[in-house]
Every structure is written in C-alpha cells, then in structure tokens.
C-alpha cells in the first residue's frame, strides 16, 4: 500500500503481496480489508499485558534442557498452545511452510528410537572401517556412538530420554532450517511458561542427517525435510537457581 499526504491510500504492486498482514495489522481503525485475510482473524494486541524485561529475563534463566521426564500426561490444550507459539515465529518472505507435528504414539516413538540406534551403529562401524576416530565436526566419535548403542541394547534410553511426546518441525523451503529453528524457540518458551520441560533431540536430528532420511520420514508420516525435533514432558524437578553466563 502507498500513502501520499493529502491523497487516498492506494494499493500498489498487488501481485507482490506475500499476505504478511502488516497492512491490515497496522491500521488502528480496522479500516483495511484484505481478500486473503478474513476480518474475524484480525485481533487487537494488548500492549499493557506485555511481560516486563525482568519477567522475560526470568523466563530465560529458568529455561533448561531438563531430561527428567515423568509419566504424567500433558494436557491437550497445553500442547496446542506450544504448537501455536511455534507457528507465530517469523518465516522468510512469510513463506509459512513450517509444519509442526505431534508424535505421541508409543509404537512410533519406539520406531524412532530404533532408527537412531540403527543409524548410530552404522555410523560407528563406518568410522571404524575408515580408521576415523570422530566425525569431521568432532561432534561424534566411534566410542561415543558405540556407547549409546550398548546402553540402548541394555534397555536404557539415552536417545529419547523416556519422553512420550515429540514435536517434529518440518519444512522443505530453502530457508526451512532457519524458519524451523525460530519456530522451535517460540515453542520452547511457551513450554517453559506452562511448566513443561522441552529438550532438543539432537541425536534424532543427527541420525536423520547421516542415515536413511526417507525411513525416518516414513516412520513419522511427514513429507518435508525434518529440521528440528523437540521432546516434551513434565519434569520430575525444577531448577531453583541459575548460573551467570
């Protein structure tokens, strides 16, 4: 839209519209209509209800990767709020191609666990064959991978940490990785507010990067690229202090 002093507001270059909603949201009188944005989907922002800087910093201090998941169930509404928060993260050129899927079926979770174990077994063997002690980035070593596999075969869960809920962030957009990471951060902060522990599933993501990608997509029932995975659960304790950084 274009505004010239003393002249009516004009629509210019309508074909370039990315449906971001900024033109509608900026009008204090709700006087702008957009063919792609129904009126009932436009809501007022209550700036008086914003958290203070101190309150927001307290949230940052409290957020941790607390892997002590209990068997307590998550409320459906809480999960919906976490996912909604993720969808309100910005995306490149407003592509909005981030998809967030909840996985809480025990059989599917078991298959994800087995996928990671199988992939790590193959990675460790390949490293041994090539005579390499660690991956190029130094993140994995053959002994580390073998240790994780052995622990899993002994009945422990160093992969999913016993979670009953995974959020899968997917996007095939060229900026999909960045978009999903932003969505993850929004979702993780909402989880913290709700008293739900969230943990980044790095092992799952690394197995996906180094293993049979289509196999994991089929297990999870997704088509786009897997960019981030979050585990959710009620923690058995909370941290009462934080250490300065």
Annotate each predicted stretch with a short phrase:
Residues 1-245:
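Acidic, surface-exposed loops and disordered segments
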């Amino acid at each position: 839209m274009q505004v010239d002093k003393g002249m009516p507001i004009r629509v210019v270059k309508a074909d370039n519209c990315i449906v971001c909603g900024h033109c509608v949201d900026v009008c204090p009188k709700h006087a702008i209509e957009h063919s792609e944005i129904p009126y009932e989907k436009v809501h007022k922002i209550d700036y008086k209800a914003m958290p203070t800087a101190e309150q927001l910093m307290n949230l940052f201090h409290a957020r941790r990767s607390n892997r002590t998941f209990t068997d307590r169930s998550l409320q459906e509404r809480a999960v919906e709020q976490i996912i909604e928060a993720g969808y309100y993260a910005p995306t490149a050129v407003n592509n909005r191609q981030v998809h967030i899927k909840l996985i809480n079926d025990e059989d599917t979770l078991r298959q994800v666990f087995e996928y990671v174990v199988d992939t790590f077994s193959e990675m460790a063997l390949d490293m041994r064959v090539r005579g390499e002690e660690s991956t190029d980035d130094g993140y994995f070593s053959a002994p580390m991978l073998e240790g994780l596999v052995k622990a899993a075969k002994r009945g422990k869960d160093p992969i999913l940490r016993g979670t009953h809920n995974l959020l899968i962030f997917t996007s095939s957009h060229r900026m999909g990785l960045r978009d999903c990471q932003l969505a993850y951060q929004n979702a993780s902060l909402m989880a913290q507010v709700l008293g739900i522990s969230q943990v980044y599933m790095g092992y799952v993501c690394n197995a996906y990067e180094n293993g049979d990608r289509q196999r994991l997509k089929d297990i999870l029932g997704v088509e786009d690229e897997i960019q981030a995975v979050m585990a959710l659960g009620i923690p058995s304790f909370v941290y009462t202090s934080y250490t300065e950084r």
